[in-house]
Amino acid sequence: MKRERLLPLIVATALFIENMDSTAIATSLPAIALDFGVEPVALKLALTTYMLALAVFIPVSGWVADRFGARPTFMVAIGVFLLGSIGCASADSLGALVAARFLQGMGGAMMVPVGRLVILRSIAKAQLVRALSWLTVPALLGPMMGPPLGGLITTYGNWRYIFLINIPMGLLGIFLAWRHIPLLLSEPKPLDVRGFLLSAIGLALTMFGFASLGRHLVSTELAAGCLLAGIAGLALYVLHARRHPHPL
């Protein structure tokens, strides 16, 4: 298979399992809540935690790929996502599920941007549009298949299998990445640690504030306080980035 087809399909494997998992869990929330003995609204914390992990770790994904290489970073990202999936499938409490979803988010935060970086750096510009089309179509199938698949599994099986079906596809993605994705190792710029912390805190608090307002995850006062603190953190990051020679 040609390179401009193979690489996008490998990356699309990771995007597929991430997008499918994110949408499939939504239809299983009542069943999960029943197993854990909590209100379904409390499980929105598991959804929010995943988004928080994405917001925190996506900004640093490019630096990690430059520092350690695109291939190992992509493979480890899928592995971390699979570990989170196993944690979700074996969770026996809301706290365990939230922690596992955060681990999934860490892996997902590296999979998506690093995978696209591989395509941009490995394929000639003349073939780039065609390559991205091979990436987009399979990746879009995940959100389409997620809800009906999640409902089917929850109705006729157990909601835990929603996370376990990620394992064979993820292992396939790791194998294909090991065989075909180039290393793409380059000399990274110094990591902007302060910028990373400011952006992580700002994005996490802002997203948590928006996600919590009106959803009864926490009190309205706490949600509003997180939102304001997050906006302040992002403002501090902008000021910091303007002065830093190598901003995040």
Question: Can you say where each PLM-predicted feature lies in the sequence?
Answer:
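Hydrophobic core positions of alpha-helical segments in small-molecule transporters
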Residues: 25, 45-49, 76, 99-100, ...
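Extracellular/lumenal inter-transmembrane loop segments of multi-pass membrane transporters
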Residues: 31-42, 93, 154-158, 213-216
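Extracytoplasmic
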Residues: 3-61, 111, 146
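Hydrophobic residues within membrane-embedded alpha-helical segments of Major Facilitator Superfamily
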Residues: 13, 17, 24, 29, ...
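Helix-loop-helix hairpins in multi-pass membrane proteins, especially solute transporters
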Residues: 58-195
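Hydrophobic transmembrane-helix bundles of small-molecule transporters
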Residues: 155-248
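Primarily residues marking transmembrane-helix entry/exit sites
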Residues: 1-12, 94, 201, 241
